[in-house]
C-alpha cells in the first residue's frame, strides 16, 4: 500500500467519502481493479516517487497522477514490508483468483471427491491470500495458521458433504426445490468456513478487547464489546461478500437449464456458468464489500462502564469513540 512509503505527512485514505455507502463502493471497485495487475516494477518505482513527494510536502495537491500512484501501490504492495505481494494474492487479483475455485465449487453434479477438492482449494486460496496480506507486525504462528486452516477445511467440507447427503432425503419438498437447495450447498459451506475462520483468528480480540480512539486519534482504552462488534460484523461481511457470487449464478443457471440450455452439452453449460459467475463477481462484489465502513463509531456509554466519563486531551467529555473493524 501507499502507506509503506515513509514521510511526515499523512496520506488521504481515499479519494472518495468512505462515510457513505456509495463512496465505499467506488473505493472497493478501485482497489480491486484487475487492470492493476499490469503494473510493472518501473511503474511502482515512479509511484513511490510521487507518494514520497507528497509525504514530504513537495507535492502540495492530490493530482490525478497522485491518485493513480496511490492506487497502484495500494493494490500491489504490502503496507508493512513495502514489498510486492505475489500476483495471485493481490487485491487487484481477487476476482480472477477466486473465479477459478468458484466455478469449480458451483459446477453442478460434483461427487464427493470433487466437492472435497474444490472446498479444499477454496480454503487454501483464502489462507494464502490472508497470509500474503497479513499484518507483519503481529505475525501468526505456524501452529495457529495450521489450526485455522484445518478448522476452515473441516467446516467447509463437513457442511458440503453433510448437506449433499441431507438434501435428497428431505420430505415434503418438490424435486425442483431440492435441486435449488443442492445448488446452494457450496454457499452454505463457504459461509460456515468463513465464520469459523474469523472467530478462530480473532478470538483473542474478543477475550482481551480492542483499542478504541477519540476523534483526535488518541486511545481511550480497550473494549471487549467493541471487539465483539468488530468481529461479528467481519463474520457477517463474509456472508454478504459470498452471497452474490455463490447464490445468484446457481439460481440463474437452474432457470437456464430448464430453458435455453436444456439439452445442451456439458461444455456449453460450463461456459454459461463461467460467464454468469464472472459478470456477478465483477459487478456485484464492490457493492458487497462496501456495506460496512472500515472505521466504526459507537457512543461511549454503550461500552464498558470503566470507559464512561472519559475526557479528551482538551478536557472535554468524549461522546463517541472509533475503532477499526478489521478484515
From Swiss-Prot:
InterPro entries: Mtc. Signal peptide: none annotated. It is found in: Mitochondrion membrane. The chain crosses the membrane at residues 98-118, 143-163, 179-199, 272-292. One of its GO terms (molecular function) is transmembrane transporter activity. Its main location: mitochondrion. It is a multi-pass membrane protein. It comes from the Eukaryota. One of its GO terms (biological process) is cellular response to anoxia. Keywords: Acetylation, Amino-acid transport, Membrane, Mitochondrion, Transmembrane, Transmembrane helix, Transport. The modification N-acetylalanine is found at residue 2. GO terms for cellular component: mitochondrial inner membrane; mitochondrion. The keyword Cell inner membrane does not apply. Belongs to the sideroflexin family. Present with 9290 molecules/cell in log phase SD medium. NCBIfam families: mtc. Mitochondrial amino-acid transporter that mediates transport of serine into mitochondria. This is Sideroflexin FSF1. It comes from Saccharomyces cerevisiae (strain ATCC 204508 / S288c).
Amino acid at each position: 500500500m501507499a502507506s509503506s512509503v515513509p514521510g511526515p505527512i499523512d496520506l488521504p485514505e481515499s479519494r472518495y467519502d468512505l462515510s457513505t455507502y456509495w463512496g465505499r463502493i467506488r473505493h472497493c471497485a478501485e482497489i480491486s481493479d484487475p487492470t492493476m495487475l499490469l503494473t510493472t516494477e518501473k511503474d511502482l518505482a515512479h509511484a513511490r516517487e510521487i507518494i514520497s513527494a507528497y509525504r514530504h510536502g513537495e507535492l502540495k495537491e492530490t493530482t490525478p497522477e497522485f491518485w493513480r500512484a496511490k492506487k497502484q501501490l495500494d493494490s500491489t504492495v504490502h503496507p508493512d514490508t513495502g514489498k510486492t505481494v505475489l500476483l495471485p494474492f493481490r487485491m487487484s487479483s481477487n476476482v480472477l483468483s477466486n473465479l477459478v475455485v468458484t466455478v469449480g465449487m458451483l459446477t453442478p453434479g460434483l461427487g464427493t471427491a470433487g466437492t472435497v477438492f474444490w472446498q479444499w482449494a477454496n480454503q487454501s486460496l483464502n489462507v494464502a491470500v490472508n497470509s500474503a496480506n497479513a499484518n507483519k507486525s503481529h505475525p501468526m504462528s505456524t501452529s495457529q495458521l495450521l489450526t485455522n486452516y484445518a478448522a476452515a477445511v473441516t467446516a467447509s467440507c463437513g457442511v458440503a458433504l453433510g448437506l449433499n447427503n441431507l438434501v435428497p432425503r428431505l420430505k415434503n419438498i418438490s424435486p425442483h426445490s431440492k435441486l435449488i437447495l443442492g445448488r446452494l450447498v457450496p454457499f452454505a459451506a463457504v459461509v460456515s468456513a468463513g465464520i469459523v475462520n474469523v472467530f478462530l483468528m480473532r478470538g483473542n480480540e474478543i477475550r482481551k478487547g480492542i483499542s478504541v480512539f477519540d476523534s483526535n486519534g488518541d486511545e481511550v482504552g480497550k473494549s471487549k464489546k467493541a471487539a465483539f462488534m468488530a468481529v461479528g460484523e467481519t463474520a457477517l461481511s463474509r456472508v454478504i461478500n459470498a452471497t452474490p457470487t455463490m447464490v445468484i449464478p446457481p439460481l440463474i443457471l437452474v432457470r437456464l437449464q430448464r430453458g435455453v440450455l436444456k439439452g445442451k452439452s456439458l461444455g456449453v453449460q460450463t461456459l454459461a456458468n463461467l460467464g454468469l459467475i464472472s459478470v456477478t463477481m465483477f459487478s456485484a462484489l464492490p457493492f458487497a464489500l462496501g456495506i460496512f465502513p472500515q472505521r466504526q463509531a459507537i457512543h461511549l456509554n454503550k461500552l464498558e462502564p470503566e470507559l464512561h466519563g472519559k475526557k479528551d486531551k482538551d478536557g472535554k467529555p468524549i461522546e463517541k469513540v472509533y475503532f477499526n473493524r478489521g478484515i
